[in-house]
């Protein structure tokens, strides 16, 4: 799975791609071609 800063253009790669929001992150999942999986949203800042 790739991590990108913007998934605007990646959501239209295939007609089977879906946008899913889980735990504050946005995912693009594709069941027909799993290579197209993408996640947006980086690591959260940890407190010391």
Curated annotation (Swiss-Prot):
PANTHER family: 50S RIBOSOMAL PROTEIN L36 2, LARGE RIBOSOMAL SUBUNIT PROTEIN BL36B
Annotated NCBIfam families: PRK00831.1, rpmJ_bact
GO aspect biological process, one term: translation
Keyword Cell membrane: no
Keyword Metal-binding: no
Keywords for this protein: Chloroplast, Plastid, Ribonucleoprotein, Ribosomal protein
Record's GO cellular component terms: chloroplast; ribonucleoprotein complex; ribosome
Localization (cell): Plastid, Chloroplast
Similarity remark: Belongs to the bacterial ribosomal protein bL36 family.
Superkingdom of this protein's organism: Eukaryota
Species annotation: Guillardia theta (Cryptophyte)
The name this protein goes by in its record: Large ribosomal subunit protein bL36c
InterPro entries documented for this protein: Ribosomal_bL36, Ribosomal_bL36_sp, Ribosomal_L36_bact
Main location: plastid
MF-aspect GO terms: structural constituent of ribosome
């Amino acid at each position: 799975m790739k991590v990108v800063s913007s998934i605007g253009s990646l959501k239209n790669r295939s007609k089977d791609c879906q946008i899913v929001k889980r735990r504050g992150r946005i995912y693009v999942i594709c069941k027909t071609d799993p290579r197209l999986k993408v996640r947006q949203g980086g690591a959260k800042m940890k407190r010391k």
